[in-house]
Design a protein with these regions (language model features):
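Alpha-helical segment proximal to the catalytic Tyr-Lys
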Residues: 142, 186-187
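Residue(s) in the substrate-gating loop at a strand-loop-helix junction
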Residues: 157
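C-terminal helical subdomain
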Residues: 190, 197-198, 213-255
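Substrate-binding pocket helix/loop in short-chain dehydrogenase/reductase
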Residues: 108-114, 118-123
């Protein structure tokens, strides 16, 4: 049987990928997987030491071009542009963006009722999670549109589809990421650029430390499990699109956003 262009799996070898939030958690796990798959990886993070540590780690795993580390703040337009340009300068193309950078709340702030949340915390969360997504997505678009190919994967959350108590600002930011992603996906179809959102449930990453003494839910997802889904998504044939992928632990807590269909009371 003959193979048709666009219907075969997308080979990640020789592709250039920019991963924000690449210094830890899901972003670092994505960097490891993409390096093993043969992609050229730009590890972008706010923390230069973490970005360099992941770059050094994946350099030993890489089967493709040597990875690079980029340091900057996704909230700043100049840094977002520098992330994109730095990837292009190093690899002469930009095929993949995995935008994983994000915050939950102020460090060690702990969950609070909305009237207790400061403007400082609101600005931090919205500017990082939503405005940062806008700025970095916008920065990579010209290169992808010129190539008539590319794939953007934005990290939203299950908190981007159902509101949760004590997480009002975080939920608002992740709802926004989902809306931005869906709108951009419609805009980019004509240019051959895919735009997808991944919505993981609670993940065992340093982000959870921002909840202070409150323990992470049991079970929580391993970051590599989320990274594996992202790698699978990026390897899909060009004529196939997966949208708004919700990732849950198999032995998950009972979902509160779905009502039973058999007439029985919800728990």
């Amino acid at each position: 049987m003959s193979e048709h262009v666009g219907t075969t799996p997308n080979d990640l070898r020789h592709k250039a990928a920019l991963v924000t939030g690449g210094g830890s958690g899901i972003g670092a796990a994505v960097c490891r997987r993409l390096a093993r798959a043969g992609a050229a990886v730009a590890v972008a993070d706010f923390n230069g030491e973490r970005a360099q540590a992941v770059r050094d780690e994946i350099a030993a795993l890489a089967t493709g071009p040597a990875p690079i580390a980029l340091v900057g703040d996704v909230r700043l337009e100049a840094d977002a542009e520098r992330f994109a340009q730095g990837t292009l300068d190093a690899f002469a193309r930009l095929d993949v963006l995995v935008h994983s950078a994000g915050v939950l709340r102020l460090p060690q702030g702990g969950p609070r009722l909305m009237h207790q949340i400061t403007k400082e915390e609101c600005d931090l969360v919205i500017d990082t999670n939503l405005k940062g997504t806008f700025l970095v997505n916008r920065a990579v678009l010209p290169a992808m549109m010129k190539q008539k190919a590319g794939h953007i994967v934005n990290l939203s959350s299950t908190s981007g589809r159902i509101g949760r108590a004590f997480d009002s600002v975080y939920c608002a930011s992740k709802f926004g990421v989902l809306g931005l992603t869906e709108s951009l996906a419609e805009e980019m179809k004509q240019f051959g650029v895919k735009v997808s959102a991944v919505l993981p449930d609670a993940v065992a990453t340093p982000l959870w430390d921002q909840n202070g003494p409150i323990p992470a839910p049991d079970p929580s997802l391993d970051p590599d499990r989320v990274a594996g889904v992202i790698e699978y998504l990026l390897a899909m044939p060009r004529d196939v699109s997966l949208e708004n992928i919700v990732i849950l632990p198999f032995k998950t807590r009972r979902r509160k956003d779905r009502k039973p269909t058999d007439g029985s009371p919800s728990g």
